[in-house]
Regions:
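Divalent metal-coordination and catalytic microenvironments
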Residues: 8, 35, 59, 94, ...
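Tryptophan-centric aromatic hotspots in well-structured domains and transmembrane helices
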Residues: 11, 66, 108-112, 137, ...
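Catalytic pocket-lining loop regions of alpha/beta-barrel enzymes
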Residues: 33, 48-159
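Mid-to-C-terminal alpha-helical segments outside catalytic/metal-binding sites
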Residues: 147-148, 152-159, 168-206
Length: 206
């Protein structure tokens, strides 16, 4: 109904016995681009479970992406997952949700860097404002985290996401956009365009 919507990342029960049939059904709609499960709400080993990985193994067949939505302590499981499926496109959502208001956690830093070594993994620059204490922040709080993401993934595998409407818990939509735009001012217009749209078009086949 709305032509500005170019793609949807939806939920499919990847542990279902008929997962192939379900994926075929949704993939028949060209607007369906990928799958995401709220793995952050699962046990830390969720992404290494056989039934979960069986479902993920079916995604590439339908040219579907998998968004990894996790907390920092689940990064080791994500590493094991992406290593097992080198032909599957993965997107790390919300930079794995580090606590922005605290000094950078070394485990988060090391594991994100390790994850970036896999060229089939991209990172969504999103969800950061809601990872601040009491939703109080200044722009400078995010710089060390964004610096690490850019130095790890490079400018071809980072894509911006507003995390709307969840971002509204912490601030307004305009502030999220301004925050990212201000940070990206250190880069060329070409790189800025990549992060704000071009990369997403390529990664999600929009």
């Amino acid at each position: 109904k709305n032509s500005f919507i170019k793609g949807v990342v939806g939920w499919v029960d990847l542990t279902a016995k008929d997962v192939d049939k379900r994926l075929a059904h949704y993939a028949s709609n060209s607007i369906f681009k990928g799958v995401r499960h709220v793995a952050q709400a699962e046990k830390d080993n969720y992404l290494t479970r056989d039934d979960v990985q069986h479902g993920i193994s079916k995604l590439a067949k339908y040219n579907l992406t998998y968004d990894i939505l996790i907390f920092p302590q689940q990064l080791p499981a994500a590493l094991a997952l992406v290593e097992k499926f080198p032909k599957q496109k993965f997107i790390l959502d919300h930079i794995a949700k580090p606590n922005i208001s605290e000094p950078m956690n070394e485990n988060w830093k090391v594991n994100v860097k390790a994850l970036s070594k896999f060229k089939n993994v991209s990172c969504k620059l999103s969800g950061m404002v809601t990872e601040t204490k009491d939703f109080n922040f200044v722009d400078e709080d995010f710089e060390p985290y964004m610096n690490h993401i850019f130095s790890s993934f490079g400018t071809n595998r980072i894509l911006f996401g507003s995390d709307w409407p969840v971002c509204l818990l912490a601030t307004d939509y305009k502030k999220v956009i301004t925050l990212i735009n201000n940070y990206l001012d250190i880069y060329s217009a070409k790189i800025k365009a990549k992060v704000l749209g071009v990369n997403a078009i390529k990664i999600y086949n929009l």
